[in-house]
Amino acid sequence: MSDASAETAIRPTRAENFSEWYLEVIKAADLAESSSVRGCMVIKPWGYALWEHVQRVLDGMFKATGHVNAYFPLFIPLSLLEKEAAHVEGFAKECAVVTHHRLEARDGKLVPVGELEEPLIVRPTSETIIGESFARWVQSYRDLPLLINQWANVVRWEMRTRMFLRTAEFLWQEGHTAHATEPEAIDETMQMLGIYARFAEEWMALPVVQGEKTESERFPGAVRTYCIEAMMQDRKALQAGTSHFLGQNFAKASGIQFQDEKGTLTHAWTTSWGLSTRMIGAMIMTHGDDDGMVCPPRLAPQQVVIIPVIQKPEVREQVLAWCTALKRELEAQTYAGAPVRVHLDARDLQGAKKSWEWIKKGTPVRLEVGPRDIEKGAVFMGRRDRKPREKQSVPRAELVAGVGALLQEIQDALLERARTMRAAHTRVIDTKDEFYAYFTPPPTRRPNDPTPIHGGFALAHFAGDPAVEARIKEDLGVTVRCIPLEPGEPGTCAFTGQPSPKRVVWAKSY
């Protein structure tokens, strides 16, 4: 992180107050804002454009693996949710409930009337309502596998909200599949986890750990839950996506049955998997700096911005014509399988002001063009992965020919930077005392100062006792983020001395 004494566009800096820095970046980058509805946010065009690119890429990945999109009701009858006991217990405290079906004007006010015979739950997730449809759609083994994805919004009441990370309403995709056999369903679960990991690393430049959740962190009603976990710059973990093997639990609750090849009636094996707009929060906290957002080129709404520098009215037409031609040339190039996204900022503002706006938005490449640059047949280029004042003159032809390689170079640099940061703050720990010391924050200078950044990922042996896990969470606010899928050496639990099959990832988290 940068020296807090240096002049930056965002204050406080990450080192001074990471939580406040995060909110200031969202504001400065014009990503989102709070709404009048408690716990909900307005996603502004720049933030929504990021989500649209996430959707576009993931949708292609899903369809390439045989999945199709559908849409299911926002409202779930209470009786459906009650069919899966563990599921309803896990979500009960977060559910928004609709109890009336209309409003009536009384004494100048609107009053809810017409109580529903059965309350409706605003979907917190859709396993039960989709399961009802699957029960109608699946009759024979020939109907399987059933591979469905839904792009939707969900509502989960949150007491402590933070934009993009935890909001009462958020956008996501949720995949739901049904299979004839247990191995097929497990393969699907792991395939989708792999797709999430590939998307995170290749498109978001976000290094992740793939692993399984412990019993206490498992999705309500699932047999096994898998996840991808990433480290943010404050060294906390963020769960970036989950994939659940549901066994036959939801199939039995919803009545998803089919006749197999022998004519025997049996329950299907199901999965579900999801990823949400919290990925934008992950992007901010992984790549952002003290000057604002840093967008990975592959997902940036605009990959290149051209900023005309016009100090005299008489050169305006010449500079804009040159910039317009450059824009067309750059858009004719391709990067990551699509035309390069280029924006010409022709607003009547000072060049420096425009440049700083695009720095704060995180646009990967900035090109400043004035009369002198035109005379030289060049542009003045700045990269968002470097300091704002690190700019260089680049010949126009060289820039156009190499823009795809330049964007990939920035993408690779962001991924490598994130990997280096994670490696620097991942520690192998063998004793309880060392573990507690690692996650105990250093003292603050003043009583109301924010907690200093500390800790990271701890790789420690754990025998799996839920009571031990709960005690550590209570003491330190630390949880098992996942049991890594990679093979590990057996050892001794750092907390109980009992045998442990492998090390697990511990961290404080969002």
From Swiss-Prot:
Organism placement in taxonomy: Bacteria, Pseudomonadati, Myxococcota, Myxococcia, Myxococcales
GN (gene name): proS2
Family per similarity comment: Belongs to the class-II aminoacyl-tRNA synthetase family. ProS type 3 subfamily.
EC code: 6.1.1.15
PROSITE patterns associated with the record: AA_TRNA_LIGASE_II
Role summary: Catalyzes the attachment of proline to tRNA(Pro) in a two-step reaction: proline is first activated by ATP to form Pro-AMP and then transferred to the acceptor end of tRNA(Pro).
Reactions catalysed, as given in the entry: tRNA(Pro) + L-proline + ATP = L-prolyl-tRNA(Pro) + AMP + diphosphate
NCBIfam families, alphabetized: proS_fam_I (TIGR00408)
Organism field: Anaeromyxobacter dehalogenans (strain 2CP-C)
InterPro entries: aa-tRNA-synt_IIb (IPR002314), aa-tRNA-synth_II (IPR006195), aa-tRNA-synth_II/BPL/LPL (IPR045864), Anticodon-bd (IPR004154), Anticodon-bd_dom_sf (IPR036621), Pro-tRNA-ligase_IIa_arc-type (IPR004499), Pro-tRNA_ligase_II_C (IPR016061), Pro-tRNA_synth_II (IPR017449)
Entry's localization field: Cytoplasm
Keyword Ligase: yes
Record protein name field: Proline--tRNA ligase 2
Key words of the record: Aminoacyl-tRNA synthetase, ATP-binding, Cytoplasm, Ligase, Nucleotide-binding, Protein biosynthesis
Cellular component, GO annotation: aminoacyl-tRNA synthetase multienzyme complex; cytoplasm
Self-association and partners: Homodimer.
Written domain comment of the UniProt record: Consists of three domains: the N-terminal catalytic domain, the anticodon-binding domain and the C-terminal extension.
Predominant localisation class: cytoplasm
Pfam short name (any one): tRNA-synt_2b
Gene Ontology MF annotations: ATP binding; proline-tRNA ligase activity
GO biological process, any: prolyl-tRNA aminoacylation
